[in-house]
Amino acid sequence: MISDIQIMVALFAALFTGILALRLGTELYK
């Protein structure tokens, strides 16, 4: 059974990696 804390951590991790990938993509695009 997945707890709410694990879901929140997973969401924050996905959001963090998404922002990181977006910044890296824009840097490489330049």
From Swiss-Prot:
Similarity field: Belongs to the PsaM family.
Q: Which organism is it from?
A: Mesostigma viride (Green alga)
Annotated keywords? Chloroplast, Membrane, Photosynthesis, Photosystem I, Plastid, Thylakoid, Transmembrane, Transmembrane helix
- Membrane spanning stretches: 7-26
How does the entry describe its membrane topology?
Single-pass membrane protein
Pfam families in the record, alphabetically? Answer: PsaM (PF07465)
Q: What is this protein called?
A: Photosystem I reaction center subunit XII
Q: Which GO biological process categories is it annotated with?
A: photosynthesis
| Cellular component, GO, one term | photosystem I
Q: Which domain of life is it from?
A: Eukaryota
Q: Where is the protein situated, by its record's location annotation? A: Plastid, Chloroplast thylakoid membrane
The record ties this protein, via NCBIfam families, to: PS_I_psaM
| Keyword presence, Lyase | no
